[in-house]
Structures are given as C-alpha cells and as structure tokens.
C-alpha cells in the first residue's frame, strides 16, 4: 500500500473519489484477468483535439489515484473506433473532395488525404498516439479494425446473435418509427464496395454465425458476423466492448450520457459487468458551442503549447470535469497563473492530506516539481511585454534581473519559458487590440499625483506600499468604485481594460521606467 493511503482514502479530490468507486466495485478483489482495466475512446473522423487529450489526462489521474489506494495492477487502453464508416467530411483536412468519394467506408479503408499513412484512419491514429507518447502516457493502443478482423470480438458477436431479440427489445423503443423498421445492431461490410451498410437484416443465424440482408438489386447476401465482415452499431458496440475486454472504468462526454444506460444493459445481456463510469461535461468554444474535431473550432494541443507550459493545460483538464467550461485562448493566462499558485502552495504545505488534495499532486502523479518565479506571474509578464514591446525575451530578462538578481534563464528555466510564451501571446492576441484612453483633466491630476509619489519613494520600497499609495490616490480622486479608477489607469497606461496589481508591476518594470510611462501620458 502507498504511504499516503490513509490521506488518499479520505480525500475528496475527484480522482481519489473515482478510484474509491472502482475499489468498491471490485470488493477489494483482483479481477480474474489479473488487472484493473481503464479505457478511453477516440473517434478518428477528424484530427485529435484538446478534449481527446483531456480525457486521457483525466483517466491517468484516476488510474494513478487508484494505484495509491490498491496494489492491484492496472492497465490503460486507448480504443480507436477506426472501423466506423465516414459519415461527414471534416472541414479542416486537405483534399476534402477526395475524401467525400469514400462516404460510408471504414476510416481505415479510405486513402490518407495527408499522404503519410496507409489510410485516413491510420493517419488519425498516428496523430493521437504521437501526442499521447509526447506527454508520457503509458497505454496500449487498440484499433477497432484490428480487433474485429483479428477475431478478438468474435465470441461476443456470436452472443449478440444469440441475444438478438433481447438486444432489439432494448434498442427499438429508443428510435422513431421509420428507424425501427430498418434498425439492426449489425452493420455488414459490403463484399463489393467495402462500405459499412446500415440495412435491415432479413435473417440471422446464431449457429451459422451469419446475417442476411438484401442488396440494392434485391439479392439476398449472407455474411459472417465474425472476422471483420460486420461491425456493430455504435451503441451495441460500446456495451459489447465493455463485456469483451472486461473494462473496469470508463469516462465519456455528456453527449454519451443519454445512451449510457443502453451501453451498460447490453454489457449485462452479453454476460459482462458494466464498468464504473464518469460523465464529464463538454468543452465549449468562445461562442458557447460544443468543440468538434470535424469543425476544427477548438484550441489544438499545439496551439496551447505555443503560449503556455503543458502543466497549465493539465490543470484546465483537472478542474471541475463535470462542469461545462469554455475553452478558448483567453483562458490560457489564468490557468498558467493558477498552476503557479497551486505549485507554490503544495511545496509550502506541511499537511499531507492537503497536499494530496492539491491539483498539482494529480497533474504530476505525486512527483511535483518545485518551480520558482519570485512572485512573477504570467499575467505580469504579459503586462510588462505590453509596455516595452520586446523583440525577444532578453528584453524581459533585463527587467526580471533588476527585480530579482538571483534569477537567470539558466537557473530558472520555467520563468524563462514564461517570458518566451508571454511575448508570443502578446503579439498574437493583445497587441492588435490595444486601445488607449486619452486622459481627461481629472486623469491628468491623478497621473501627476502618481508621478509625484513615484518621485518620492525609495528604490527599496515594497510592492504593497506602492500599491497602497496608488490606492490612496484613487480614493482621493473621489471614485465611487475603485475598479473604475484602476480600469482608467490600465486604459491610459497599458491600452487594456484589465491589468496587474500596479505595485508589483512597478517593482518589476522599475520606478524610473514607470515615471517615463506616466510622463508620456501627461
């Protein structure tokens, strides 16, 4: 057992809560297969997006939490539904008109529009695996195409035939009348075209292991359900997979919630035990719409990592998985700064129970690196970048070194990366939107007061003292709401509606530099 077992078993951190559910479902016993199986799924119709990363990151958090509670071995598989027929051509791929010729073909039977792999599905799988590998996930990759064709599901597919009536009785009430007339859990792969067919099944034979359907010419075609000659509809497929692989834990997006009962019931019909399940909320774009691989309306992994460290992305995934969150570029700075705060709290905290409840414990699976930024946040660096418009990070380091002589790019690589990220983010998202407020006569009086205050203070004056002095100037100016006062200052001095704590910012930027900035507006 882990040395933190006692704290972990009492913890309300959601990965430990989920891990306890799994342990309870097993009654503390090792499963017959010898390990606890965690499964994530991937639909490779379009390029993997950040939500795909999120599901795997969260799954590993639960897996590692379970390993703190139990000595039972674990395994994580990532299952790709790459045998699904193409239903819609993604808008963000090259040569979409070529792909459109292969509608209803299994994704692994469509030529690779990127020209790199043996099929479109193989390319998408490779993209998924490359970034899972990049972030150090330990997993086994399962391809639906390979599982069906290799016979891994054959026993279960025969059982679906044997339980055909029971499964139909479960499924049919969920459809409209016209769909009821044509539905079958089996989708034959057309021997002539290779397409995944959604056709009525005229006859099924459990002993022979076959289904029969009518082709367009009216001919009866009999095909085996085994060996990759048929694919299950996605709802029965989900439940069948749970039973076949003996999955112990699965998480899925809210779009699956309405069908989760069906997955579980089909798993039971096929003699399996449904896994413990977590339904997470979907990410929304800045307009409140669901992000989609095929639409390409989300932040990609590469997008996020262009502007921020991977830990900030992992924190975004950790926070409130059952609550809908908007995922767009504006959330990046906030998550970087929250990560810095959680990291510092973790290393200052002596109470082990509080440490294992800290998000960074789960992000780093218990091995939390210590970072030092000397109180400099990502937001502060963005504001520094905004006033000095640096060509490269060495300009920012000039200010950082004056603020904290101990800090260097070599001894503080995290801070060095933040400086680089801040310049990129500023150039791409802030620079073009800067809009300065022309100071009124009232504002000029305030600016003169700030200038006088800066002229009177000593270089060693603490940030809090500077902040209080600026606060007092706002009070003296008669603002009913000091938020309006600071907003005016940010608009006049930075060209932005929001900004930093000015005391800390002035310490970083330098009193003399700040005086020049204020003088420039007078």
Swiss-Prot record:
Q: Which UniProt keywords apply?
A: Aminoacyl-tRNA synthetase, ATP-binding, Cytoplasm, Ligase, Nucleotide-binding, Protein biosynthesis
Location of the motif 'HIGH' region: 44-52
Q: State the similarity comment.
A: Belongs to the class-I aminoacyl-tRNA synthetase family.
Q: Which PANTHER family match?
A: LYSINE--TRNA LIGASE (PTHR37940:SF1)
Entry EC no(s)? 6.1.1.6
Q: Which PROSITE patterns match?
A: AA_TRNA_LIGASE_I
- The answer to whether keyword Nucleotide-binding applies is yes
Catalytically driven reaction(s): tRNA(Lys) + L-lysine + ATP = L-lysyl-tRNA(Lys) + AMP + diphosphate
- For the motif 'KMSKS' region, give the residue ranges: 290-294
The places in or outside the cell where this protein is found are: Cytoplasm
**Cross-referenced NCBIfam families, in alphabetical order?**
lysS_arch (TIGR00467), PRK00750.1-2 (NF001968)
Q: Which residues form a coiled coil?
A: none
The record's InterPro entries line, in alphabetical order, gives: aa-tRNA-synth_I_codon-bd_sub2, aa-tRNA-synth_I_CS, aa_tRNA-synth_I_cd-bd_sf, Lys-tRNA-ligase, Rossmann-like_a/b/a_fold
- Which Pfam families does the protein's record reference? tRNA-synt_1f
Which parts of the sequence bind ATP? Answer: 293
Q: What is this protein called?
A: Lysine--tRNA ligase
Protein source organism? Rickettsia rickettsii (strain Sheila Smith)
What's any GO biological process attached to this entry?
lysyl-tRNA aminoacylation
- UniProt GO cellular component terms: cytoplasm
Molecular functions (GO terms): ATP binding; lysine-tRNA ligase activity; tRNA binding
């Amino acid at each position: 057992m882990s040395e933190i077992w006692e704290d972990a078993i009492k913890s309300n951190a959601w990965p430990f809560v989920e891990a306890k559910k799994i342990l309870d479902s097993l009654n503390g016993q090792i499963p017959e297969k010898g390990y606890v199986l965690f499964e994530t799924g991937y639909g490779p119709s379009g390029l993997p997006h950040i939500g795909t990363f999120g599901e795997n990151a969260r799954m590993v958090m639960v897996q590692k939490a379970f390993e703190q509670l139990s000595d039972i071995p674990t395994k994580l598989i990532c299952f790709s539904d790459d045998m699904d027929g193409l239903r819609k051509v993604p808008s963000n791929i090259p040569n979409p008109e070529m792909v459109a010729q292969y509608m209803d073909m299994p994704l692994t039977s469509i030529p690779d529009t990127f020209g790199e792999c043996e099929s479109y599905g193989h390319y998408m799988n490779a993209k998924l695996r490359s970034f899972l590998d990049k972030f150090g996930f330990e997993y086994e990759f399962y391809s639906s195409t390979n599982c069906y064709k290799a016979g891994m599901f054959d026993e279960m597919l025969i059982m679906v035939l044997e339980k055909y009536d029971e499964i139909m009785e479960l499924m049919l009430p969920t459809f409209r009348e016209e769909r009821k007339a044509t539905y079958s859990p089996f989708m034959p792969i057309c021997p002539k075209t290779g397409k995944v067919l959604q056709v009525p099944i005229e006859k099924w034979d459990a002993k022979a292991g076959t289904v029969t359907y009518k082709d367009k010419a009216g001919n009866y075609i009999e095909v085996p359900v085994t060996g990759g000659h048929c694919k299950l509809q996605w709802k029965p497929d989900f439940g069948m997979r749970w039973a076949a692989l003996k999955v112990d834990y699965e998480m899925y997006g809210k779009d699956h919630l309405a069908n989760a009962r069906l997955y579980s019931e089909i798993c039971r019909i096929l003699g399996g035990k449904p896994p413990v399940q977590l339904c997470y909320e979907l990410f929304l774009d800045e307009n409140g719409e669901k992000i989609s691989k095929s639409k390409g309306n989300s932040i990609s992994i590469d997008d996020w990592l262009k502007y921020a460290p991977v830990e900030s992305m992992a924190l975004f995934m950790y926070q409130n998985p059952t609550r809908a969150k908007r995922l767009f570029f504006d959330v990046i700075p906030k998550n970087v700064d929250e990560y810095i705060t959680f990291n510092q709290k973790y290393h200052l905290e002596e109470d082990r129970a509080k440490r294992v409840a800290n998000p960074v414990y789960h992000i780093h699976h218990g091995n939390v690196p210590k970072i030092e930024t000397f109180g400099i946040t990502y937001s502060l660096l963005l504001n520094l970048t905004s006033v000095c418009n640096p060509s490269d990070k060495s300009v920012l380091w000039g200010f950082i070194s004056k603020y904290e002589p101990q800090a260097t790019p070599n001894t503080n690589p995290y801070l060095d990366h933040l400086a680089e990220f801040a310049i990129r983010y500023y150039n791409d998202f802030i620079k073009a939107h800067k809009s300065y407020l022309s100071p009124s006569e009232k504002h000029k009086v305030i600016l003169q007061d700030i200038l006088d205050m800066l002229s009177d203070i000593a270089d060693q004056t603490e940030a809090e003292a500077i902040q209080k002095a600026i606060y007092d100037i706002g009070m003296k100016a008669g603002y009913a709401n000091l938020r309006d006062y600071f907003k005016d200052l940010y608009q006049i001095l930075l060209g932005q509606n929001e900004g930093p704590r000015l005391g800390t910012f002035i310490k970083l930027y330098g009193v003399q530099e700040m005086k020049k900035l204020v003088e420039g507006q007078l």
